[in-house]
Every structure is written in structure tokens, then in C-alpha cells.
Amino acid sequence: MRSSAVVSYIRGVSDSDREDLGAMFAWVTRRLVDAEEPLLAANGLTMWEYVVLAQLARRPAPNQLTLAREIRHDKTRLIALLDQLQQRGLIDRQPDAADRRSHTVSITSQGRALHATVRAAIRKMEAEFLSVLSPDHRRSLLAILPRLVLPEGNPADDC
């Protein structure tokens, strides 16, 4: 069910009367999360588990603290999440050779395969979600979003 604010916006309002960007992004995010959760559940993953696999598919984490920072997750809650993923054979943690108190975190081949499967399903859902836009608008949106996500300057500065 759409809220009256969404319906008002969809029906067209002047720019001065439009909803705040935060509210509009929240509606879009809620729709995307609602569409992603069944895809994740069908593959035995929660949203946070998928976030971890996606990050580790990009690059191994030098340690658990770095991973927590990169995915913006509470470091104290991350341990239980990593325990679950490791028990399922989706990630591996090894003591850091330079600091035995620290553990490197990497995705396993099984985790990489599951990530690829889920990512393909999500990409298909996203294509359907964005089908209301023209191809040019889709390309523009996908080009603009990273600029809004990343801070000014070097994207690596925020990692």
C-alpha cells in the first residue's frame, strides 16, 4: 500500500512542494529491500549476510574491524554473523600472521558461488524495478547514484 505522501508525489506536485529527498529515497529503498528479502531468503541469506559476502567478493578484509567499518556494521555484532557464515562454509577466517589477535576474513569458493547466484537474481529484480524508466534514464540513474553515495574526493578515503 502506498502512503498518501507517495501518491501525492506521484500525481505531480511543484518542486517546492515535493517530498524531501530522504523521504523519496526511503520509499525506493523500502521497495528494493522488500523485493530483495525473498530472493535472499530463498538462498538462505539475511540482508547482512549478503552484505558481508558482497564486500568480501570485492576484496578480502585485512581484519574483522576493517570489515565492520567497510560495511558500516556494529563490530560487536559482526562476530556472530561471521561465525554463522563460517560454519556454513561461506567465509574463512585466519589468524593474521602479523598480529595473531586479529583475523583476516575472505570468501570461500562456496560463498563466491552463492553470492554470484544471489547477485544475478537481484540484478534481474532490479531490471524489472527500473523497467518503468527509459533506457537513457536507467543509464543516467545508475551513473548518478555512485556520485551521491561516495563523498567528494577520492572514494577510497571513505573506506
Region spans (language model):
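N-terminal leader segment of winged-helix/HTH proteins
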Residues: 1-43, 159
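Charged, amphipathic alpha-helical coiled-coil/dimerization segments
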Residues: 3-4, 33, 61, 65, ...
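Flexible interhelical turns and helix-capping residues at alpha-helix boundaries
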Residues: 14, 29, 60, 71, ...
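Conserved acidic
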Residues: 17-24, 28, 77, 103, ...
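Active-site phosphate/pyrophosphate-handling residues
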Residues: 20-23, 51, 66, 77, ...
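Short, locally clustered residues in the helix-turn-helix/winged-helix DNA-binding domain
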Residues: 26-29, 54-58, 119, 146
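N-terminal helix-turn-helix DNA-binding core of bacterial DNA-binding proteins
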Residues: 30-77, 156-159
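Conserved alpha-helix in the HATPase_c
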Residues: 80
